[in-house]
Structures are given as structure tokens and as C-alpha cells.
Regions:
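Extended, structured, electrostatic nucleic-acid-contact surfaces
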Residues: 69-79
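A glycine- and small-aliphatic-rich helix-loop capping segment at beta-alpha/alpha-beta transitions
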Residues: 154
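Single, function-defining residue in the core of a domain
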Residues: 1-67, 94-96, 103-107, 111, ...
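Major-groove recognition helix of helix-turn-helix-like DNA-binding domains
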Residues: 77-96
């Protein structure tokens, strides 16, 4: 149930209120830089159609075009946007440079940070709250499965096709600080240098075993960046010395989510790896611990260049890396980046970058409305009320903490019984006659 219809500060639809968050100058500058020229279907109209497709999870070109045609008057009020036609929309996705959507995303991110500094502020919780003065980044990638018969440009392995989204996520605000969309044929470590170019001295990087490349780790250490990566079993290490570990109390052993087993100082054993990791005298720290994952305790080993933090801190930092996996799961559940409305590379990139933009706008709405429930539920409410004329922030605030919108729907007048469409009551016509 939704709140009763009362006077609000706006007569705009929820859909228009969300779109109005994007300043027109950002779209104009991005279109100019990418040299997108058009006579009728403007870059703003193109971006608006893709945002609607993401926000409502529409699965086809016809779905977007039919919705725009059904609400043609409302669509035109959004800064004079043109209603998309199927062929025009498809050609724009195929031919226009998706760099425009990427520029709009990053500049919109900067705009929201200036508009509401608390939106992008660092908010570490729990064990990581001790790192208030350090930025913690999680590096990972997510594979987007495609069909080889349709997406032949994205051939992955022998009989598969896939695209890949590389992400450097700031764990303080759970927002991306770097992203690349490309075909999945490249290994994750190929984009590691570019994805971490914005890290500063004193920052912390956590990554999985795909990024355990000693040449890459050496470059991070030389820049003063602390890293925590998972050890690969095929990498041979030579133990130099063992460090003492704290033993948990008997009563807390079963409740602990991290239990340290070993803490050792190691060197790369193979000549090739030792040559690649020449910084810090080739000395590394290897922490082995049992970490809770999906309700089970798994033994994992981590490599780091920090010799001062406790072994439990190293393990807890790696546990924080799962925040980027939560981000990918959240993105795929709320935005349309599994079923694509175009087959070529440009169309896929347009849709992925627009999905990231819509996800960021929804995150902003969650922040300003102080939403207390799951993110997928917020996306569902916004999707269901896209054409409702309500203040979108007041609508989300009305759900409160109990999960039910304050104020119910009350029946004002019932003139006659209501029947299902195309059905009549039993006694509506003469009995025993055809027709």
C-alpha cells in the first residue's frame, strides 16, 4: 500500500524526478566531446530511453518504444526528449560512441559528491572502523555471460561469449572509483595497473588470487600502497621466520569468524618470481587463517607487504573484499545487464554504463530518503511507481522502519460491482439463448 494522495511539492512523476537529477550540461558536454551528432534523436533522448530501460528492467526495444509512445506527453516534457523508434534506437546503440555514457557516469558521480558530500563519505563499520584515515579499495571483475551466436565479437574460450566489468570499489562508500567494460578474453591482471592508478600512498588494496602478480604487487609497494591478496597454490614460497599468533579464548573459538593459524615471513622461492618482486628486499608476509564464508570455515592464505598490523587485521581486510561481490550481485539484481537490447560491442557498453548510472541514482535516493530496507526492494518500489505523481523521497520515507507504507488505500465510492475484464456476471444475459 502507498501513502494517501496529499498535496506535495511537485506534480512531476517519480520517473521525471529521478531524471531531473542529471544536469543537462553534463549530457551536452559528454555528447560534444564524443562527437555525437544527431538531427532528431538527440543524445539526451537516447540516454533517457536507456535509463528507462534500466530503471524498469525492460527486456526489448519494443518495450521501451511502446512505453514512450503510450506516455508521449510526459516523455516530451523531460527537456523535450523525442519518443524513440525501434530502428532509430537500435542504430544509436550500434553506432554511437559509448564513451558518452561513461563520461556522464563519472561526471554525475562528481556532481552528486558536491551536491551531497555525505553520500560519498567514508563509512567504515565494524572491524574496519579503525581505518578511518585510510582508503580501502577492493579490486575484482564480474563476467557477463553472452550468447556466442549473437555476440561473436565477445568470444570467450571455445564455445562461449562473455563481457567483463573490471571494478575498483571504494569499500568506504561502496561506490566505484574505476571501471572498465570490455570482452572477457583478457585476464583480470591485465587491467590491474590501470584500475589502481588512482591509489595514493597509504591506501589499502584487497584483491583475490587473480591479481597475485608479483610485478604488479611490487609496483604497489613502491608507491607506498598496502595490499592484501590471496595466495595462489602454484606459487612457491620460502619461509624465513614465523611470527607469534594470538590464540582465541576457549569460549569464543566457535563464535569467531576469523581464526589465525600461521603468521610467517616468506620470500618468493622461484628465480622468476623473486626477480619480479625486488622491492622491500623480496620480503613478504603470509598469514594463514580460517575465515567464515557462507557459514563454513575455510582455510585461506594471504600475502601482504604490511609487517605491523595483526594477523587478524589482515584476514578481516580480506573479508571486507566481499563487499565488491555484493556490489556486483546488487547491480545485476536491480539493473538490466543480463538481457541486452543490442548485439554489438557498443550496444553492450551503452547498456552496462547506463546500468551503473541508474544504480548510482538509486543509491543516492536510498541515502537521501534514509531507506531502511533492502536495496532490491527500493528498486522495486521505484520501478512500480515510475509514473506516479508523488514526491519520490517522501514516498520512500513513508515506508519507515517496519516495511509498510504509512497510510492505506481507502475506498471512496463503489457505484456498481467490479468484474474481471471480458467477464460478465452469470445473470447478465438471457438464459438458453446463443449470441
Amino acid at each position: 500500500m502507498f501513502p494517501p494522495q496529499v498535496a506535495t511539492k511537485t506534480v512531476y512523476t517519480n520517473w521525471k524526478q529521478i531524471v531531473k537529477l542529471i544536469p543537462p550540461q553534463i549530457v551536452l558536454e559528454a555528447a560534444t566531446e564524443t562527437k555525437i551528432l544527431s538531427r532528431t534523436f538527440t543524445p539526451w533522448s537516447h540516454l533517457l530511453a536507456l535509463i528507462y530501460q534500466q530503471l524498469t528492467r525492460t527486456e526489448s526495444l519494443n518495450g521501451v518504444c511502446d512505453a514512450a509512445a503510450a506516455f508521449e506527453c510526459e516523455w516530451g516534457r523531460m527537456r523535450g526528449a523525442q519518443v524513440p523508434h525501434r530502428n532509430t534506437f537500435s542504430n544509436a546503440n550500434r553506432r554511437r560512441d559509448p564513451k558518452m555514457a561513461e563520461l556522464v557516469f563519472w561526471r554525475m558521480f562528481d556532481y552528486l559528491k558536491r551536491l551531497c558530500p555525505e553520500f560519498a563519505s567514508c563509512k567504515y563499520r565494524g572491524f574496519l572502523s579503525r581505518f578511518k584515515e585510510r582508503a580501502i579499495h577492493a579490486l575484482d571483475s564480474s563476467t557477463i555471460q553472452l550468447t556466442l551466436n549473437c555476440f561473436d565479437w565477445a568470444r570467450h574460450r571455445r564455445r562461449k561469449a562473455a563481457a567483463k566489468l573490471h571494478m575498483n570499489l571504494d569499500l568506504g562508500n561502496r561506490l566505484p572509483s574505476f571501471a572498465i567494460v570490455e570482452e572477457a578474453s583478457h585476464h583480470d591482471s591485465v587491467r590491474a595497473e590501470a584500475a589502481t592508478a588512482n591509489l595514493k600512498c597509504g591506501d589499502i588494496l584487497v584483491a583475490d588470487r587473480a591479481y597475485t602478480d608479483f610485478k604488479f604487487l611490487c609496483s604497489l609497494a613502491m608507491r607506498g600502497v598496502f595490499y592484501v591478496v590471496r595466495w595462489k597454490r602454484n606459487i612457491k614460497l620460502e619461509v624465513v621466520s614465523a611470527r607469534p599468533t594470538e590464540k582465541p579464548e576457549a569460549g569464543k573459538r566457535s563464535e569467531a569468524k576469523v581464526r589465525v593459524l600461521r603468521d610467517e615471513i616468506v620470500n618468493p622461492a622461484m628465480p622468476g618470481t623473486a626477480k619480479s618482486y625486488s622491492c622491500d628486499g623480496g620480503v613478504l608476509r603470509c598469514v594463514t587463517a580460517e575465515v567464515e564464508y557462507d557459514g563454513k570455515m575455510l582455510e585461506m592464505s594471504f600475502l601482504t607487504n604490511n609487517m605491523e598490523w595483526s594477523a587478524r587485521t589482515i584476514a578481516e581486510l580480506y573479508r571486507a573484499r566481499w563487499g565488491v561481490e555484493t556490489f556486483f550481485k546488487e547491480l545485476k539484481q536491480t539493473c538490466q545487464i543480463r538481457d541486452f537490447i543490442g548485439y554489438n560491442e557498443n550496444a553492450v557498453k551503452w547498456q552496462v554504463w547506463t546500468g551503473l548510472l541508474v544504480h548510482m541514482l538509486l543509491r543516492y535516493l536510498r541515502h537521501v530518503s534514509k531507506w531502511k530496507h533492502s536495496f532490491s526492494r527500493l528498486a522495486g518500489v521505484v520501478r512500480a511507481c515510475a509514473w506516479l505523481r508523488r514526491n519520490v523521497v517522501e514516498l520512500l520515507e513513508s515506508f519507515g522502519a517496519n516495511g509498510t507504507a504509512r497510510g492505506g488505500i481507502r475506498v471512496v465510492e463503489v457505484a456498481r460491482p467490479l468484474y474481471l475484464q471480458a467477464f460478465l456476471p452469470f445473470d447478465a444475459g438471457p438464459m438458453g439463448q446463443h449470441g
